Amino acid sequence: MDMSRRQFLKVTGLGILSVAGMSALAGCGSSSKGSGSSSDSKVAAIKERGKLKCGVKKDVVGYGYLDTKTKKYEGLEIDLCYQIAAAVLGVSYEEAVEKELCEFTDVTPKTRGPLIDNDQLDIIAATYTITDERKKSWDFSTPYRTDHVGVLIKKNSGMTKMADLDGKIIGVSQGSTTKDLVLQMLEDEKIDATPEFKEFPDYPSIKSALDAGNVDAFAMDRSTLKTYTTDDCELLQPEIEFGAQEYGVATKKGCDLSKTVDDTVKKLQKDGWLDDEISKWGLL
């Protein structure tokens, strides 16, 4: 059947629009393999912005802590962020610190993943434990620190051993792996105890609950607990080391920034910088 001129132009026009639309969609998802660049490049975005957006803790002394007097963040993970910023932006560590080439945002175990996913942050350096499950969603660097879980109690609690946790309420942080690790420890040590768990949005809230008697214990990584160990508190059976936590820097899954971050951490391990930092911040 012959096609009129109007019909021909309509069909041809639709075809052109269709091809153009497909090309545009392809550009959103990826770039040409041969181009060596991408509109989705995290490294390029950071260089254009001139700063690295970092998710850190504000309440863990030695790792990520916001000094309320100076209004500045300090700790091993803060220094590590500046090292990564220096590597990405092609400047020295000293220059990165002096020019404040990191933009810090407080994160919690519940918020850190989503902030990476929606590109509000470039990296997370916030005592973020590497697990097989988490590696399905985010990229992690080589571990820069290994810690263990501890259980903080009041000295007058009457508890002297892990078995005394039976029926007690343990405060843990939302989105952390602590609950599972405590239960695994009780099973591994063949300790007959069934505690309850209560989740809190942040560490200060758990400590406040412990002080108020709303929970009987505060379980978390030992380095974190060190921040909250006051004169009237102590670790329950500190000789039981469990729940080894390997901390890594998290980045968006599959992004080009991941390699730079991992290479930087490996270099800092090799040249002894990380060991010096651990000593500097009293994390031995």
For every predicted segment, state its role.
Residues 54-61, 73-91, 129, 146-202, ...:
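Bilobed "Venus flytrap"/periplasmic-binding protein-like clamshell domains
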Residues 58, 145-156, 222-266, 284:
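Periplasmic-binding protein-like
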Residues 43, 73, 77, 127, ...:
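A structural signal for short loop-to-beta-strand junctions that line the ligand-binding cleft
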Residues 40, 47-123:
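Extracytoplasmic small-molecule ligand-binding "clamshell" domains
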Residues 94-163:
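Acidic, polar ligand-binding/catalytic clefts
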Residues 9-28:
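N-terminal export signals
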Residues 30-34, 47-48, 95, 99, ...:
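Ligand-binding clefts/hinges and TM-proximal coupling segments of bilobed small-molecule sensing domains
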Residues 111, 125-137, 181-185, 209-243:
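A ligand-binding cleft/hinge motif common to bilobed small-molecule-binding domains
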